[in-house]
Swiss-Prot record:
Molecular-function GO terms, alphabetical: DNA binding; zinc ion binding
Lineage, highest ranks first: Bacteria, Pseudomonadati, Acidobacteriota, Terriglobia, Bryobacterales
Protein family: Belongs to the RecR family.
Record flagged with keyword Endoplasmic reticulum: no
Pfam families (alphabetical): RecR_C, RecR_HhH, RecR_ZnF, Toprim_4
Record's protein name: Recombination protein RecR
Keyword field: DNA damage, DNA recombination, DNA repair, Metal-binding, Zinc, Zinc-finger
Signal peptide: none
One GO biological process term: DNA repair
InterPro entries: DNA_Rcmb_RecR (IPR000093), Rcmb_RecR (IPR023627), Rcmb_RecR_Znf (IPR015967), TOPRIM_dom (IPR006171), TOPRIM_RecR (IPR034137)
Gene3D superfamilies in UniProt: 3.40.1360.10, 6.10.250.240, RecR Domain 1 (1.10.8.420)
Role played: May play a role in DNA repair. It seems to be involved in an RecBC-independent recombinational process of DNA repair. It may act with RecF and RecO.
Domain of life from the UniProt record: Bacteria
UniProt keyword Zinc-finger present: yes
Length: 199
């Protein structure tokens, strides 16, 4: 690796810590910032700080929110009786691009993974059970990723939630096993939502 001036080397190192960014991409990004106007670099750094300082988790569903409640939980046009459970906030983006789901969400912030030491207590499941206990939820659509952890999470949720009197469905296949909802196109996600099956 070539020797870079310390500030540039540090920026490259920080960019490499981002998912999907290797050495060459990190270098390209760092040189872009170096060539950019100071004002543009300040806007970028302020946007990063704002994300950390001004965003939190929705008190209802654990999605990203810039207030106490996210835009989906506060939207009175959405159906509160249908809740789609996803692993991460970015999974909501893929579902929303279909423009077909009109219910609400619940974000687990992960999936069960005994090999990595992630058990049910480490996920945001308690709030989902509490929402169901309030009596408004009729159906829970489990839209965890189609991999081992996602399937294990789906089975666990079905066993936990069915005795509470709600219909538990799993999104249909069409999303390749081992993939992530984030990378699926809107038609595939739309078909998976239409083809959901009861668990």
């Amino acid at each position: 690796m070539p020797d870079f001036a310390e500030p540039l080397a540090r920026l490259i190192t920080e960019f490499k810590r981002l998912p999907g960014i290797g050495q060459k991409s990190a270098q390209r990004l760092a040189f872009h910032v170096l060539r950019a106007k100071r004002e543009d670099a300040e806007h970028l750094s302020q946007a990063i700080l704002d994300v950390k300082d001004k965003l939190g988790l929705c008190a209802v569903c654990n999605n990203i929110a810039d207030g106490e409640i996210c835009q989906y939980c506060s939207d009175s046009n959405r159906d509160p009786s249908v809740v789609c459970v996803v692993e991460e906030p970015h999974n909501i983006v893929g579902i929303e691009t279909t423009r077909q789901f009109e219910g609400r969400y619940h974000v687990l912030h992960g999936a069960l993974s005994p090999l990595r030491g992630v058990g049910p207590d480490m996920l945001k499941i308690k709030g989902l059970v509490e929402r169901i206990g309030q009596g408004e939820v009729r159906e829970v659509i489990v839209a965890t990723n189609p991999n081992v952890e996602g399937e294990a999470t789906a089975v666990y949720l079905a066993r936990l939630l069915k005795p509470l009197g709600v219909k538990v469905t799993r999104i249909g296949m069409g999303i390749p096993v081992g993939s992530d909802l984030e990378f699926a196109d809107e038609v595939t996600i739309s078909k998976a939502m239409e083809g959901r099956r009861e668990m």
